[in-house]
Amino acid sequence: MHNSKEFYESVTNNIIDFYNKNNRLPWVRPWSNSNSGFNISFTTKKEYQGINQIILMMSPYESNKWNTFNNWKNLGFHLKKKSKGTPICYFQMNKVVDKKTDEESFYPMLKKYYVYNAEQIENNSTLIDKPKPKNKILPIDEIDSYVKNTNAKIVEHVTNEAFYRPFTDSIHISNINQFKSSYDYYATLLHELTHWTMHESRCNRKSSNRFKSVGYAYEELIAEIGSTFLCNQFKMDSASHTNLQNHVNYISSWLQALKDDPKFIFKAAAESQKAVNFLNSFQQIVKAA
């Protein structure tokens, strides 16, 4: 448990330090990246989940391919000298048996392990994607279909704002032509779609309606991270998502919450991942139909 506490505090302090040094949060990248998308395990091709995505977003590497030391070695690759691993985690369920009643119970225990980026590999030309011309046209149909499959109620209007209204269970957003780019429109829509999952019939998240309250800021953080995960899923550059820079009202609340509770970002990332998984489940249902 002591090691778990240290890991929570280490990740939290790294995020705070990252913000202080870069004046941005780790999931906001002010540049385009030819290797954009979710950070993945090079061996399994699976995406890292929740807090692990955020930890890997803080790395200085552009490649989104990662592996453990042994997995790189088994594939015939060698690390560059003095390469340092990036610590990430998983939760292992431990069993406890009550000596009096013989009843079994389980509790999650955090386990830490290290991964290395493809850019830390010697002779890595086969691992690094070549820069591609940036597409000016977003695959709009793909995201439109994704949103439509959720059956979320979308209301377009001409005001310069976007929000999810709980009591009507509807998403309100400006017309796409009012945005600077289609990227900004869809990133904003995905942000509000993450809010939409808070409804009691979906992920059932409780949130305060008071602007700038801790509960309100926490829900905004969940939607912020959820939108980023979805942008990565659709391989959209966060550099194009100007909405990510519009949360200065919440940053002080987030930083204070991080300082007060080392598990705060872990909880938010877990809720964001749960929301994304919920939204993705609609796509699986449609494909199976």
Placement of each model-derived feature along the sequence:
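N-terminal accessory/interface modules of nucleic-acid-binding and processing proteins
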Residues: 1-289
